[in-house]
């Protein structure tokens, strides 16, 4: 009976499960709803359980000999009540091996490189960086959430865009590209007083993290040459650079893996890569599919000899 391994990536927006053989060949794959065990433990456990059931539909769960699952907010799994919820869905899926829950930073790093040591930055709705040694997270910076940190994140960009629009209203200035697009998105066109009141009303009527939805407006205005957008992009990239600098020493030649929507083909991502190249040595690599990185780490957990560069290339396309 062939041994299989399972990789998982449980994030706030989606959950992915991948089951592969020892050669990296796919035996099962599923994608479903996301969930964070810190904010929605029951929902996160249910999302994981559903994804597990579908990924394992065509295989014997008893064949799965090792697993690694990256979890955003994985520290919540140390809480007995949350751990019990996750243990229940794991057992219901017929799995008997250890789930191998890990920080999503470790999985993101493995999704970008087979190297054991280096630095990873995840910048999407939130932002956090980590130092990785021997494929395990040893230090972190930021990731403190929208109220206390996540500097340079999608939330941060959205908040700065709204603040720029409010300053424009306060000053009675003609609206630039960024301010105009923010006011339109918030249905806050009109007089300065009406605009300010409407912006405040709309923003405070939604969860704060939803400000991240305005981040693309910053990118669009940047491409149109808006000076406010340019300033926000430059400050965001500088903040992310500083976050990396808190976990990485200058002179290290190990890889820097970038994950998350902001690090891709965006003005912040491009500016950040320029800043990183100027300050640090070592290759700057994009994270590929997170679930592939998790499956590759699961192969290493089963037998380090299986976690080859070839299987990494197959899984992390």
Each predicted region: which residue ranges?
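Short beta-strand-loop/turn "lid" adjacent to the catalytic site in phosphate-handling enzymes
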Residues: 36, 55-93, 100-101, 110-114
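Short glycine-aspartate micro-motif
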Residues: 5-9, 66-68, 100, 118-122, ...
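N-terminal loops that bind phosphate or other acidic moieties
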Residues: 72-75, 123, 224, 268
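A short glycine/serine-rich beta->alpha loop
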Residues: 37-38, 73-74, 143-151, 280-285
């Amino acid at each position: 009976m062939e041994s299989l391994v399972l990789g998982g990536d449980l994030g706030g927006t989606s959950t992915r499960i991948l089951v592969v053989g020892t050669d990296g060949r796919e035996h099962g794959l599923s994608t479903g709803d996301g969930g964070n065990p810190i904010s929605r433990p029951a929902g996160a456990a249910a999302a994981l359980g559903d994804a597990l059931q579908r990924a394992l539909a065509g295989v014997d769960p008893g064949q799965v000999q090792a697993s690694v699952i990256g979890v955003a907010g994985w520290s919540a799994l140390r809480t007995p009540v949350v751990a019990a919820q996750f243990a229940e869905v794991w057992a219901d899926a017929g799995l008997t091996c250890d789930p191998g829950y890990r920080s999503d930073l470790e999985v993101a790093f493995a999704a970008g490189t087979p190297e054991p040591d280096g630095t990873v930055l995840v910048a999407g709705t939130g932002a956090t960086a980590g130092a990785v040694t021997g494929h395990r997270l040893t230090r972190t910076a930021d990731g403190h959430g929208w109220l206390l940190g996540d500097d340079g994140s999608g939330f941060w960009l959205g908040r700065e865009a709204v603040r720029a629009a409010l300053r424009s209203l306060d000053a009675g200035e003609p609206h630039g590209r960024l301010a105009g697009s923010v006011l339109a998105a918030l249905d806050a066109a009109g007089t300065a007083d009406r605009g300010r009141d409407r912006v405040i009303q709309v923003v405070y009527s939604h969860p704060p993290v939803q400000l991240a939805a305005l981040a693309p407006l910053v990118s669009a205005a940047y491409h149109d040459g808006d000076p406010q957008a340019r300033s926000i992009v430059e400050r965001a990239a500088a903040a992310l650079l500083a976050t990396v600098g808190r976990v990485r020493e200058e002179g290290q030649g190990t890889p820097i893996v970038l994950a998350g929507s902001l690090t891709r083909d965006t003005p912040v991502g491009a500016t950040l890569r320029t800043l990183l190249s100027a300050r640090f040595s070592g290759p700057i690599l994009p994270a590929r599919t997170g679930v592939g990185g998790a499956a590759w780490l699961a192969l290493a957990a089963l037998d380090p000899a299986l976690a080859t560069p070839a299987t990494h290339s197959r899984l992390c396309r």
